[in-house]
Amino acid sequence: CIRDRDLMRTGYIRKGVNRRQQKALPKSKPYHYRSTDGIDIYVGKNAAQNDRLTGDARPNETWLHAKDMPGSHVIIRKEGEIPRQTLLEAAILAAWYSKGQNSSGVPIDYTLRRYVKKPGGAAPGMVIYTNQRTLFMTVSESDVRKIQLVEE
């Protein structure tokens, strides 16, 4: 309709994607890394993917995120005791894929997935969590390159 085209052109409305087109779009996958201990680590690339990644994680898997700043959700795909080196590598990834990437001493919170909740009606990627511990990380690109990237 002409009126709709004019409204789109002026920015008052946006062209919508119908449900059939939406389903046809392939969902992107998170970054997949493998720690030096051989444990899989997944890193969300955007808010919607962070929701899926965190929502699909098992309750006893470890979840990490940069404290009080935008960043990727990181999941260590191992239940139970996590080797210290794997935890540090996951924290490096959480710091690198956050707004604190170029800062020193970036606080990275980690907790079990069971303590991460998404409030009803919250924006994509927004969660609240408890029982966390905090690591302070300063990272460089060379630190990230040392961690094996399995799939982009």
Segments from the language model and where they lie:
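Duplex nucleic acid-engaging cores and interfaces of nucleic-acid transaction enzymes
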Residues: 6, 11-152
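Conserved small/polar residues in nucleotide/adenosyl-binding loops
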Residues: 1-4
